[in-house]
Amino acid sequence: MVPAVNPPTTSNHVAVIGAGAAGLVAARELRREGHSVVVFERGNHIGGVWAYTPNVEPDPLSIDPTRPVIHSSLYSSLRTIIPQECMGFTDFPFSTRLENGSRDPRRHPGHSEVLAYLRDFVREFKIEEMIRFETEVVRVEQAGENPKKWRVKSRNFGDISDEIYDAVVVCNGHYTEPRHALIPGIDTWPGKQIHSHNYRVPEQVKDQVVVVIGSSVSGVDISRDIANVTKEVHISSRSTKPETYEKLPGYDNLWLHSNIETVREDGSVVFKNGKTVYADTIMHCTGYKYYFPFLDTKGEVTVEDNRVGPLYKHVFPPALSPGLSFIGLPWQVIPFPMFELQSKWVAAVLAGRVSLPSQEEMEDTKMFYLKLEASCIPKRYTHLMAELDSQFVYNNWLADQCDYPRIEKWREQMFYKVFKRIQSQASTYKDDWDDDHLIAEAYEDFVKFPSNYPSSLIEREYTS
């Protein structure tokens, strides 16, 4: 059911935490709805996880709570999993080519191109004027004297600010605080361990035997990245059958195994398939935790086994809505358009243009959790949208709430295509495709937005 869309009635003072892609589009949408916005960014630049740095944390596993935190988890060779046409916000196409050809022309561009796109976005919509750089949010809580207000404490080079806001939108990302595999015997295993958060270049493991834990797209991508400089790479996957043992095509030194059974003091790693290797390094490509160390909700919002909840539609905690919201929690999605639609919804709700259900109705989210449990789906997969159509059903629901056009069919079909290519041609999918007709449809749409994609380039690209 689509709610009634009303004229905006309220202008709020809103704090946005984080100047990555989610925070940037949230700031734009909030201001479009007439809100006053302050974006808090602890770094000195925009981009969040897309701002590459060669620096790594001193603790290679990123376990030490006192460590200096490096926000980005990018490695040097990383290219986008999703084609550039899909990546962009719906009204600001992802342009990777200037007239002089000075930018990355690949359909799956490198991470620096994504950061360049976000900088273009900031420039086009004058977002930088809303950002407080080098300002870390250290505490967010309801203002005691007025629970409908929010107290935000922030730190800038030792100076503490204490301010009151009408609403807080949390956009701090979830690719900074690593998750780790639990490995029997690891306390006495003599080799090195590293989380992929601290992986940058293959030379870090040159001439070594490496065991990579995790067979997700990023785990396999990193394994291929290091295979040319290592002696051997062994991928451990918990999603394969116990007897799994196979050499991956295109490499003489890259194997896929089932899960690790145990590791031993002599440096050996024993897999459930019975194979044993002597490894120098174990690399954890095991994902990340949702982490909000600044947020105090008196237990209304918790993170339990990587479930942030309870949240209505992954965004609003029923007991604290609409003053507190989260953008960007779902994963295995096309992120930027989803961030945009979530932000439109939050901005419209805060403006009074769109209404939320009652708290009781929103608490039906608990039934959703019970259904997951009944289906034996672990809590850590609450925000996973791995089923091919689930994210588009969700995106279209968000669009309907705001009376905004649904996600384009070409974008949806393009995502399906790339997903199939990943499964059938994992080593070549970024440079070999069969959906030129969808690219043409995308460029036809891009003509509507000439500010970021000159029409001369559009015509040349989809007709060449």
UniProtKB/Swiss-Prot annotation:
What is this enzyme's class at the first EC digit? oxidoreductase
Biological process terms in GO annotation: stomatal closure
Q: Residues that bind FAD, according to the entry?
A: 18-23
Q: Which cofactor does it need?
A: FAD
Q: Which InterPro entries match?
A: FAD/NAD-bd_sf (IPR036188), Flavin_mOase (IPR000960), Flavin_mOase-like (IPR020946), FMO-like (IPR050346)
- Family listed: Belongs to the FMO family.
Name under which the protein is recorded: Flavin-containing monooxygenase FMO GS-OX-like 7
Organism of derivation: Arabidopsis thaliana
